[in-house]
Swiss-Prot record:
Keywords: Chloroplast, Plastid, Ribonucleoprotein, Ribosomal protein, RNA-binding, rRNA-binding. PANTHER family: 40S RIBOSOMAL PROTEIN S15A. This is Small ribosomal subunit protein uS8c. Part of the 30S ribosomal subunit. It comes from Ostreococcus tauri. It is found in: Plastid, Chloroplast. One of its GO terms (biological process) is translation. It holds the Pfam family Ribosomal_S8.
Length: 122
């Protein structure tokens, strides 16, 4: 049983990229689905496919170099909109959990809201 589903998601994606897979399965939780949708909108992942047996499949796109978990269950990291810095000079994206849902750091800065910094992808 996995306690940290976000770390599990990032590890599955990282391993699939390193193994040159075209798709991988992720645990179907609300947070993981929301993060995957943000990554699809930002162009880091391809379309999300059908959910089955508690898992859903995502198609991978080439070009992703790194996945980094920022806020962990033991050490939560929060930032307001002024503290959110661009990832890799705007080439990457930070995924933020805000009061208005899960979104990118760019969108959170534009809306002037902060939240928990879940992960960074570049």
């Amino acid at each position: 049983m996995v306690n940290d589903t976000i770390s599990d998601m990032l590890t599955r994606l990282r391993n699939a990229y390193l193994a040159d897979k075209e798709q991988t399965s992720l645990k179907a939780t609300r947070v993981v689905k929301d993060i995957a949708q943000v990554l699809v909108q930002e162009g880091f992942l391809g379309p999300i496919e059908q959910e089955e047996n508690g898992f859903f499949t995502v198609n991978l796109k080439r070009g992703v170099k790194q996945f980094e978990r920022v806020s962990t269950p033991g050490v939560r990291v929060y930032a307001n909109h002024k503290q959110l810095q661009p990832v890799l000079n705007g080439m990457g994206v930070a995924v933020i959990s805000t009061s208005q849902g899960i979104m990118t750091d760019r969108k959170a800065r534009a809306l002037g809201i902060g939240g928990e910094v879940l992960c960074k992808i570049w």
